[in-house]
A protein has these predicted regions:
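Residues that recognize and position ribonucleotide moieties
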Residues: 8, 25, 93
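Conserved N-terminal beta-strand and adjoining loop/helix that marks the start
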Residues: 1-15
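Structural detector for helix-capping/boundary residues
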Residues: 30, 44, 95-98, 103
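C-terminal lobe/hinge of AMP-binding adenylation domains
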Residues: 20-22
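Active-site-adjacent beta-strand/loop module that shapes the phosphate/pyrophosphate-binding cleft
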Residues: 63-98, 108, 112-116, 120
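Hydrophobic residues embedded in beta-strands of well-ordered beta-sheets
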Residues: 15-16, 25
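The catalytic Nudix box helix
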Residues: 27-60
Length: 120
């Protein structure tokens, strides 16, 4: 089973989404490196994909979908004004939490955001 750190960065009922060239919108995150904790992977992936530095990291939930275990974290960041797509990421957007049904996102991401919204 693949293990992934998935990040929810929410501001004013909008969630940060990223996209690779030609890909679907998704929450920032990625696979854990050997010996890396899920929390450390979340911090690293957010920085590598968006340039954002984590101020606070809260473990929200664990969800298994399609052979992947997602460790989901909510973050607050120190440098929101420095948001930009980096490395393999070509786009970043803030999208309303209540309008994700309008986007091309995976069922896994939809499930994660739905579980997060139920906790609010």
């Amino acid at each position: 089973m693949k293990v992934r750190a998935t990040i929810i960065c929410e501001q004013d009922r909008h969630v940060l989404l990223v996209r690779k060239q030609g890909g679907r919108w998704t929450l920032p995150g990625g696979k854990l490196e050997r010996g890396e904790s899920a929390a450390d992977a979340a911090i690293r992936e957010l920085w590598e994909e968006t340039g954002l530095r984590v101020d606070e990291l809260i473990y929200v939930l664990e969800l298994e979908t399609d052979g992947t275990r997602h460790h989901v974290f909510e973050v607050s960041v120190l440098n929101l004004e420095q948001l930009r797509p980096l490395n393999e990421i070509t786009d970043c957007i803030w999208h309303p939490l209540d309008a994700l049904h309008n986007l091309n996102i995976s069922d896994a991401m939809r499930s994660i955001v739905s579980a997060y919204v139920r906790r609010l």
